[in-house]
């Protein structure tokens, strides 16, 4: 094992600077002459995506086969941190087998709005639940000697303009909603690394945000690992290093090294800043490489497939079961309809896309079951194109069956990294088919595949609804077993399903192309809004049915937690997820009506009862006092609410809590909309009161951070031409029903990313020349680009020669 302190004395300043950026798309820089190995990083929130050949960060090129587990959005419905730890261990084992040192996951973004195209990669709208699950994944991954890298830190809630948007959020909301999940993950999971997000937070890029990285992450939480940029997410590398960012990825080449050297020479940063970052990076490199060298190069694919199936089983959510239609009786004549039954949708698109070791198919599993499958019909085009012939054939088959199993869902491009959803609806051709089927056979079981929320105005047209989410490569077997009763679906929703998208508090201004993203709703995301505003929803947070029933009784409560008895009052075994919420009536503060503070899973045989305890931790009663700039507790009477969902509260006890708050957090207490939770249309004045300062107004500037999608603002025909070509290509791909992820990435990419993602082929000085052209200085800009290009080639060659010791 290398001694980092001695090694830092041995390295030249240039060598140190070179180590703080990647060498290739997914590889760090190694220096064999100093005993520093090169290590692999790989995407892997729900399955490893190591690209042995040509690499990219969008999941466009093939990767080495790996187990595709259910997505985070699915596993969250299990409310099972221990399951997350098992999945994490399997991910770590596969990473070690493929010589990957860092798994880029899990994803911890809060589900502020269900239209986020990447929601399938994230756990929940609740930071406590998300943090607990993420900590489990992290512990599992790192148990195999591999580093986990939770992401994206922080306040990153949309894909639109994700590399250049500025999240404007008040400090209390930042702390209580968007950072608490990360805090739990860091303190309980102890990750070796963490990934910063692309966006700005209150005017400063997350990757160079001193408040986030140095004051909170490293200072308050004690994180001593490596902060890794998202791919191409570095803005000012020197400022990032100074303020706590460790490794710039993917491969900016020699330009990044020269940037740091110049910053040291100018006094912008010191060599001790660079040493501090290397003291975070090098132990990770040495430790993971040593663990990988000792790890087997194979893993038990069959065992991991079995784990993926069990994870899918625990993640199924039964949303409707009218007349106890499910489970289906042995020998039932069933018609299987829907393209998803034969061509499974089991994962999302983008950098998390896994090349699965195998994929189970629901139709095959149903044919192999004890049901009498009388036939299959595609029923609809999965990409939304109307087809009367497909619908007619499906309806004819439905008339011959006792029960119809109709597989519906979102297609592959509806949910993806790089773009946000345009609505929460299923394709109309699927809804039309369901209505036509219901007219000829009312006994319909809908199996729904999606990575996030969908609107369900069609719910009355089916008798049962089983939410399969995105269940991974083994999800089909889990669904088949649930339909036949071999598995009792006991999952519960980790996010609220609204009646309509317009009910979502951030609906009016989500994913606009404005430079600023204003978090006007504050604390009120998900159930925190719906319960406070007393707004009806389709399915509440924490909701899920079962083939059995449970009774809660004999609750005892104090400041430490609650204990109660849970009894299985039904006729089959099942698992109940008991949820603990707190509420404070007549609070001096505005606060959500209920907040999740604990949960427990309990599996019981028919008639069995068990005493369970749910402990409260140090985060249970705290709030962030923006006036005192610290965590405090409001004293007084609290209600401890235990229930089967946020709306289905079974037991309640009141306790008295000693407070610490001595000063009210808000000088201006006239924040009526926040006290009422009426945040659908927060005024500028109220939002400024919440922020404590005027609302920043983002202005489009022709500089390094101008995105390619904003080149229509350029004072250059070349800029307009590039913008026009990209826009046309993007529009064409949308009209084909298959948005091009590569073009989307380029469209939302700032000019500076050209210098961060081209392996040194383009320098930042060349980007500055391009900016001059776009500002209207065509000749000067072109001359500078050419001059800097020649200079860049020469300087890169000289640097590589020095680093090789030639």
Where are these regions (language model features)?
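Terminal connector regions
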Residues: 618-665
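Charged, amphipathic alpha-helical linkers/stalks
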Residues: 646, 653-723
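A generic signature of intrinsically disordered, low-complexity regions enriched in glycine/proline
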Residues: 47, 368, 507, 572, ...
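Glycoside hydrolase catalytic-domain context in secreted enzymes
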Residues: 1-619, 623, 637-641, 646, ...
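Long, low-hydrophobicity ectodomains and other hydrophilic envelope-associated domains
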Residues: 689-806
């Amino acid at each position: 094992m290398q001694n980092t302190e001695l090694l830092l004395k041995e390295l030249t300043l240039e060598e140190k600077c070179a180590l703080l950026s990647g060498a290739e798309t997914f590889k760090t820089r190694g220096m064999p002459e100093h005993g520093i190995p090169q290590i692999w990083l790989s995407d892997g929130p729900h399955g490893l995506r190591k690209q042995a050949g040509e690499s990219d960060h969008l999941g466009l090129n093939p990767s080495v086969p790996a187990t595709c587990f259910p997505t985070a959005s699915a596993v969250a419905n299990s409310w099972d941190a221990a399951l997350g730890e098992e999945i994490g261990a399997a991910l770590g084992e596969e990473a070690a087998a493929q010589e990957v040192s860092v798994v880029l996951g899990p994803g911890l973004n809060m589900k502020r709005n269900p239209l986020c195209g990447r929601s399938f990669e994230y756990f929940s709208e609740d930071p406590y639940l998300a943090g607990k699950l993420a900590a489990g994944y992290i512990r599992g991954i790192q148990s195999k000697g591999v580093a986990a890298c939770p992401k994206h830190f922080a306040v990153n809630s949309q894909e639109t303009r994700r590399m250049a948007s500025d999240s404007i959020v008040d400090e209390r909301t930042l702390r209580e909603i968007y950072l608490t999940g990360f805090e739990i993950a860091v303190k309980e999971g102890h990750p070796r690394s963490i990934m910063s997000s692309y966006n700005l937070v209150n005017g400063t890029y997350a990757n160079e945000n001193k408040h986030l990285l140095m004051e909170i992450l490293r200072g308050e939480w004690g994180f001593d690992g490596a902060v890794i940029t998202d791919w191409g997410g570095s803005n000012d590398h020197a400022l990032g290093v100074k303020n706590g960012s460790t490794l710039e990825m993917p491969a900016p080449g020699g330009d990044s090294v020269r940037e740091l050297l110049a910053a040291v020479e100018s006094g912008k940063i010191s060599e001790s800043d660079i040493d501090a970052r290397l003291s975070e990076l090098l132990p990770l490199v040495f430790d993971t490489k040593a663990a990988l060298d000792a790890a087997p190069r194979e893993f038990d694919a069959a065992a991991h497939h079995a784990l993926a199936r069990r994870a899918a089983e625990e993640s199924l959510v039964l949303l409707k079961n009218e007349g106890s239609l499910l489970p289906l009786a042995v020998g039932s004549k069933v018609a299987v309809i829907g393209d998803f039954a034969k061509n499974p949708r089991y994962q999302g698109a983008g950098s998390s896309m896994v090349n699965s070791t195998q994929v189970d198919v629901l139709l095959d599993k149903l044919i192999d079951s004890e049901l009498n499958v009388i036939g299959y019909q595609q029923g609809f085009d999965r990409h939304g194109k109307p087809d009367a012939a497909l619908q007619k054939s499906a309806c004819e088959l439905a008339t011959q069956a006792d029960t119809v199993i109709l597989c519906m869902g979102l297609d592959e491009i509806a949910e993806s990294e790089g773009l946000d959803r345009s609505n929460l609806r299923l394709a109309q051709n699927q809804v039309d088919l369901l209505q036509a089927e219901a007219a000829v056979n009312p006994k319909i079981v809908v199996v729904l595949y999606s990575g996030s929320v969908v609107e369900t105005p069609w719910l009355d047209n089916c008798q049962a609804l089983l939410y399969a989410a995105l269940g991974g490569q083994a999800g089909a077997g889990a669904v088949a077993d649930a339909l036949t009763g071999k598995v009792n679906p006991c999952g519960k929703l980790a996010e609220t399903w609204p009646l309509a998208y317009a009910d979502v508090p951030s609906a009016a201004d989500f994913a606009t192309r404005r430079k600023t993203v204003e978090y006007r709703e504050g604390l009120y995301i998900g159930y925190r809004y719906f319960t406070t505003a007393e707004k009806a929803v389709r399915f509440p947070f924490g909701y899920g049915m079962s083939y059995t029933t449970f009774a809660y009784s004999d609750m005892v409560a104090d400041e430490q937690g609650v204990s109660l008895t849970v009894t299985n009052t039904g006729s089959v075994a099942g698992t109940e997820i008991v949820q603990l919420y707190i509420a404070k009536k007549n609070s001096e503060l505005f606060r959500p009506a209920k907040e999740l503070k604990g949960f427990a899973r309990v599996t019981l045989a028919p008639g069995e009862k068990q005493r369970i305890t749910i402990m409260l931790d140090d985060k249970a009663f705290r709030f962030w006092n923006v006036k005192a700039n610290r965590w405090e507790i409001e004293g007084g009477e609290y209600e401890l609410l235990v229930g089967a969902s946020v709306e289905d509260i079974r037991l309640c006890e009141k306790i008295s809590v000693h407070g610490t708050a001595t000063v009210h957090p808000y000088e201006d207490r006239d924040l009526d909309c926040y006290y009422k939770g009426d945040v659908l249309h927060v005024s500028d004045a109220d939002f400024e009161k919440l922020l404590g300062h005027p609302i920043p107004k983002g202005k489009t500037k022709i500089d390094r951070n101008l995105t390619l999608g904003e080149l229509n603002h350029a004072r250059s025909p070349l800029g307009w031409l590039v913008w026009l070509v990209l826009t046309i290509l993007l529009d064409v791909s949308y009209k084909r029903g298959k948005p091009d992820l590569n073009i989307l990435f380029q469209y939302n990419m700032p000019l500076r990313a050209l210098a961060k993602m081209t392996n040194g082929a383009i320098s930042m000085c060349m980007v500055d020349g391009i900016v001059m052209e776009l500002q209207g200085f065509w000749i000067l800009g072109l001359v500078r680009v050419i001059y800097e290009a020649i200079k860049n080639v020469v300087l890169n060659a000289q640097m590589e020669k020095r680093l090789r010791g030639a």
